[in-house]
């Protein structure tokens, strides 16, 4: 697993939660 990929997915999830 790539850290960047994981962080990217987490970032997207957080973005949706913030909305």
From Swiss-Prot:
Main location: secreted
Cellular-component GO terms for this entry: extracellular region
Tissue spec. comment: Expressed by the venom gland.
Cell compartments where the protein resides: Secreted
Any one GO molecular-function label of the UniProt entry: toxin activity
GO biological process entries: defense response to bacterium; defense response to fungus; innate immune response; killing of cells of another organism
Keyword annotations of the record: Antibiotic, Antimicrobial, Fungicide, G-protein coupled receptor impairing toxin, Immunity, Innate immunity, Mast cell degranulation, Secreted, Toxin
Keyword field contains Secreted: yes
Reported function: Mast cell degranulating peptide. May also display antibacterial and antifungal activities. Its mast cell degranulation activity may be related to the activation of G-protein coupled receptors in mast cells as well as interaction with other proteins located in cell endosomal membranes in the mast cells.
Family in the record: Belongs to the MCD family. Bombolitin subfamily.
Protein name: Bombolitin-8
